[in-house]
C-alpha cells in the first residue's frame, strides 16, 4: 500500500546524478518524477523554438533514464501540484531552485500553498556552487562587478558541496490518470529545421558529460587564449564546446554545475573564472531583477535599446 510518496519536480535539472531534489525524494517509499510545462508564469520569457526543441529532446532522454516513468503535464504548476497531492498519497515535494525572478515568485507561492495542505516542501541547490545570498562583500552588500566577485568572493568562500551520485534505489510511480506524453507538449518545430541540428548534438545527461570531457581534453588548455581570437580555429573549438554546448546543457540541467565546476577548477585556474560567469548571473539577477532590461551602474543610465 502506498503511504509515502514524494514528488520530484524536474525543471532545469534533467539528470539523475548530482540531483539533490531527486536524492531527497528517493529517501521516501515511492518517487513520482514530474515535469510541468509552465504556461502560466513565464510571461515574456517563454523559451524560443530552438530551446523548445532542446527541451523536447531532453525530456525524452530524462524519461528514458527514468524507465519511462516521467509524468508530464502542461499548465499552471500551482494548480497541477495541488491536484496531484490531493489525488495521491503525497507526503513531500522536492525541487531544485531556479533563480529567475518570476520562477522564485512562483515557487514561493507554491511552497506556501503546499505547506498549508500539510505537505513537506523542500527546495535544494542543484545548479550553483554558492547561493546568491552566500557571496557578499565585507559590508554585507552583493557584488556588482565580476572580477572582485570571483577573486574576493568565490575564491574565499567555503568549499562547494561534494557532488552526489545517482540514487541507487528508487521505487518510481506514474500518474497514469492525468499525465501527458512528451510529444503532446507540442515542442517540436512545425517545420523540420531541427533535422539539420540533431546530427551535431547528443542531448541529455550522457551527451552533456561527453561534451564536458571533450572540452577538458580539446578546449580547456586553449581557452584563455582561444576565447579572444575569433578568427582562429581555437576560438571556434572553445566557443562551440564551452559556450554553445554548455549553456544549453546547463539550461536544461543535464550537466550538473557543482560537479563540472569543481572538476574544471582543479584542472585550470585560468578557465575557472570563465566558467563562473553563469554563477554571477544567477546570483545578481535575483538581487537586481531589473538587470534583465536595465543597467545596474548609474554611470550609464541610458536605455538598453539593443534588447528591444
Label each region the model flagged.
Residues 1-160, 264:
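Trp/Phe/Arg-rich N-terminal binding region typifying the photolyase-homology
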Residues 14, 59, 135-138, 198, ...:
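Intrinsically disordered, low-complexity regulatory segments enriched
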Residues 119, 142-296, 300:
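Glycine/tryptophan-enriched, flexible segments
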Residues 302-308:
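Acidic/His metal-coordination segments adjacent to aromatic residues that form catalytic metal sites
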Amino acid at each position: 500500500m502506498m503511504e509515502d510518496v514524494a514528488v520530484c519536480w524536474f525543471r532545469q535539472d534533467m539528470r539523475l546524478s548530482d540531483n539533490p531534489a531527486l536524492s531527497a525524494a528517493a529517501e521516501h517509499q515511492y518517487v513520482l518524477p514530474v515535469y510541468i510545462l509552465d504556461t502560466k508564469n513565464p510571461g515574456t520569457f517563454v523559451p524560443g523554438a530552438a530551446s523548445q526543441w532542446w527541451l523536447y529532446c531532453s525530456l525524452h532522454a530524462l524519461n528514458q533514464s527514468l524507465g519511462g516513468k516521467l509524468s508530464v503535464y502542461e499548465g499552471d504548476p500551482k494548480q497541477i501540484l495541488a491536484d496531484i497531492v490531493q489525488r495521491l498519497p503525497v507526503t513531500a515535494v522536492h525541487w531544485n531552485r531556479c533563480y529567475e525572478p518570476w520562477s522564485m515568485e512562483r515557487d514561493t507561492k507554491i511552497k506556501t500553498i503546499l505547506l498549508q495542505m500539510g505537505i513537506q516542501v523542500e527546495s535544494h541547490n542543484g545548479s550553483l556552487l554558492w547561493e546568491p545570498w552566500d557571496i557578499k562583500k565585507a559590508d554585507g552588500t552583493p557584488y556588482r562587478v565580476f572580477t572582485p566577485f570571483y577573486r574576493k568572493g568565490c575564491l574565499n568562500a567555503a568549499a562547494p558541496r561534494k557532488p552526489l551520485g545517482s540514487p541507487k534505489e528508487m521505487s518510481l510511480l506514474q500518474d497514469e490518470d492525468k499525465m501527458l506524453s512528451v510529444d503532446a507538449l507540442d515542442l517540436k518545430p512545425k517545420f523540420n529545421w531541427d533535422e539539420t541540428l540533431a546530427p551535431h548534438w547528443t542531448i541529455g545527461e550522457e551527451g552533456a558529460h561527453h561534451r564536458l570531457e571533450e572540452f577538458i581534453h580539446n578546449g580547456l588548455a586553449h581557452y584563455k587564449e582561444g576565447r579572444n581570437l575569433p578568427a582562429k580555429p581555437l576560438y571556434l573549438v572553445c566557443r562551440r564546446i564551452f559556450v554553445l554546448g554548455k549553456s544549453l546543457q546547463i539550461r536544461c540541467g543535464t550537466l550538473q554545475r557543482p560537479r563540472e565546476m569543481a572538476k574544471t577548477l582543479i584542472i585550470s585556474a585560468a578557465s575557472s573564472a570563465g566558467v563562473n560567469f553563469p554563477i554571477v548571473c544567477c546570483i545578481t539577477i535575483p538581487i537586481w531583477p531589473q538587470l534583465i532590461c536595465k543597467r545596474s551602474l548609474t554611470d550609464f543610465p541610458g536605455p538598453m535599446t539593443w534588447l528591444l
